[in-house]
Swiss-Prot record:
Protein's name according to its UniProt entry: Fibrillarin-like rRNA/tRNA 2'-O-methyltransferase
Enzyme class of the recorded protein, top EC level: transferase
GO molecular function: histone H2AQ104 methyltransferase activity; RNA binding; rRNA methyltransferase activity
GO biological process terms on file: box C/D sno(s)RNA 3'-end processing; tRNA processing
Origin organism lineage: Archaea, Methanobacteriati, Methanobacteriota, Stenosarchaea group, Halobacteria
Pfam families associated with the record: Fibrillarin
SMART domains: Fibrillarin
Cleaved signal peptide residues: none
Gene encoding the protein: flpA
Length: 210
């Protein structure tokens, strides 16, 4: 797998890890201008660490759903183009705003990813939608936001089984999510994100042509 331009492997205290160039956000280790992209704290980082073919090349316009305090989306903005970061909870948005201060291409939006009509007037067509909202109905969130993707764009989703049903077998949850997504997306690759994130599934997909 080829890493996106702007993402490299660096040594951090004897441990090789993915890294991007930018101001530190969450206390991560640094190597000069490079900061460690910790896959234990980032589902997209885990997808890249697993060698999934995300289709990212660098410079893409991105819609990031479930940005939280900016841990992952700050890395995305380090190597991406315009990056729209949707987060519903006010408290983490304050930290997200801090991450955006040194990233002129990162645009925090205090919005609900389940209501894309509330930010449709702001977000331009994007090359990538990252679905990182850990709530029931994760596939529906990805489907609702398909409208922003270009025809050859990519969905990069991290599905948390316990957010869908804490009592169900994770494999059954993942089967259900894959089936729901398949109505709107062509699934290109899926992989469990262990050992970085237990009971999570990484998904790479593209919009189905009408």
């Amino acid at each position: 797998m080829t890493l996106p331009s702007g993402v490299e492997r660096h040594d951090f205290g004897g441990e090789t890890s993915l890294a991007t160039q930018g101001q530190p956000v969450y206390g991560e280790r640094t190597d000069g201008d490079w900061r460690r992209w910790d896959p234990h704290r980032s589902k997209l980082g885990a997808m890249l660490a697993h060698g999934m073919d995300t289709g990212l090349g660098g410079g893409e316009t991105v819609l990031y759903l479930g940005a939280a305090a900016g841990t992952t989306v700050s890395h995305v903005a380090d190597f991406g183009g315009p990056t729209y970061a949707v987060e519903f909870a006010p408290r983490p948005v304050r930290e997200l705003l801090d991450a955006a201060e040194s990233r002129r291409n990162l645009f925090p939006l205090l919005k609900d990813a389940r209501k894309p009509e509330s930010y449709a007037h702001v977000v331009e067509p994007v090359d990538v939608v990252v679905q990182d909202v850990a709530t029931r109905g994760q596939a529906r969130v990805a489907t609702l936001n398909k409208q922003f993707l270009t025809d050859d764009g990519r969905l990069l989703a991290a599905i948390k089984a316990r957010s869908e049903d804490v009592t169900a077998d994770p494999d059954a949850v993942f089967d259900s999510v894959r089936a729901e997504l398949s109505a709107e997306y062509e699934l290109l690759e899926t992989a469990r994100l262990d050992p970085y994130h237990e009971d999570h599934l990484g998904i790479v997909a593209r919009p189905r042509k009408d």
